[in-house]
């Protein structure tokens, strides 16, 4: 696994390797997304960063801080409740109106929920945040990701390595819901989807990452101010700062350790590997295979037997077919 020193060495080299970079951060106005966007602004000489979030005040604050850290960058906030797929579509329209290519799509929305809460689109809001809206961003922005000269990357921050069994007729949790199912299904759907996507779009790499325990507003958002404060205090000895998380996630987003399955240019895989860091094994077991299930430190978190069993039963394609059918049903589109 890459050490923090190796992470920082790679991030320092990013500025020389890529003078410009276009990135979209869904959930970029707080927590891990905000921290990673800030690290990118520090590392890349002329970044273009789009932040997608619900809170305009938070968006304005982060934009000010990004401009202060790197005045040569271009920064944009898009207000959107991305628990709604129709809002995702509007946000993507704004991005595609402004950009011809995207190098990084970084998604970190969602929280831990103790109860089910359906949106007016008929999906559990947190399940939408953690899976459906993320995949809608991927689908809508794939032409821009594919247009990147490379390397282009999609990073889904959630629960890599925490997959489990699922009922094939309950992917959307409408048949039955529980706290455990909600977490397991979101993790498993993300991992299966990125395997499908890495095959369908082999010039883009896809990462599903468990970020570790990070000192962010997530605890308060999930359990309220009082409960969140207690949990944050208890977890402090084993948690990391947002700054360290941002550094690690910038590494995952840019290092050549996580290349696409079929790169456009084999010499442009990302920031060249620093000494002691090797090309990662994909969730399929293939080195450099394009779909990566990772721990916070960049090491492999794939549950190999479970994923192989899902693969043998064609679950990556089944999950993606279900995802597209859900988009059609919710959005009433062809």
Question: What is the predicted role of each segment?
Answer:
Residues 112, 162-163, 214-215:
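Conserved sequence/active-site signature of Rossmann-fold short-chain dehydrogenase/reductase
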Residues 26, 99-110, 155-158, 207-211:
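Rossmann-fold scaffold of SDR-type NAD(P)-dependent oxidoreductases
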């Amino acid at each position: 696994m890459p050490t923090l020193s190796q992470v920082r060495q790679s991030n320092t080299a990013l500025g020389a390797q890529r003078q410009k970079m276009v990135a979209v951060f869904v959930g970029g106005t707080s927590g891990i997304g905000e921290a990673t966007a800030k690290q990118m602004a520090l590392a890349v000489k002329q970044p273009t960063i789009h932040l997608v979030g619900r809170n305009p005040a938070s968006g304005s604050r982060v934009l000010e801080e990004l401009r202060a850290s790197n005045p040569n960058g271009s920064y944009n906030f898009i207000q959107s409740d991305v628990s709604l797929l129709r809002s995702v579509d509007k946000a993507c329209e704004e991005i595609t109106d402004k950009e011809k290519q995207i190098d990084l799509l970084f998604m970190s929305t969602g929280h831990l929920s103790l109860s089910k809460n359906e949106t007016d689109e008929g999906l559990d809001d947190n399940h939408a945040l953690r899976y459906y809206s993320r995949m809608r961003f991927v689908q809508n922005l794939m032409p821009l990701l594919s247009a990147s000269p490379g390397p282009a990357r999609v990073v889904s921050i959630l629960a890599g390595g925490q997959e489990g069994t699922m009922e094939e007729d309950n992917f959307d949790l409408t048949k039955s819901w529980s706290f455990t199912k909600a977490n397991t299904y979101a993790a498993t759907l993300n991992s299966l989807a990125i395997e499908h996507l890495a095959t369908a779009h082999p010039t883009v790499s896809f990462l599903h990452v468990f970020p570790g325990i990070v000192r962010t507003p997530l605890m308060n958002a999930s359990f309220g101010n009082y409960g969140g404060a207690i949990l944050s205090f208890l977890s402090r000895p084993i948690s990391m700062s947002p700054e360290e998380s941002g550094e690690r996630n910038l590494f995952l987003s840019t290092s050549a350790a996580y290349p696409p399955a079929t790169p456009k240019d084999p010499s442009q895989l990302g920031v060249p590997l620093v000494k002691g860091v090797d090309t990662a094994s994909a969730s399929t077991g293939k080195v450099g295979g394009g779909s990566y299930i990772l721990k916070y430190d960049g090491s492999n978190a794939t549950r190999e037997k479970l994923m192989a069993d899902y693969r043998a039963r064609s679950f990556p394609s089944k999950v993606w077919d279900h995802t597209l059918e859900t988009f059609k049903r919710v959005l009433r589109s062809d």
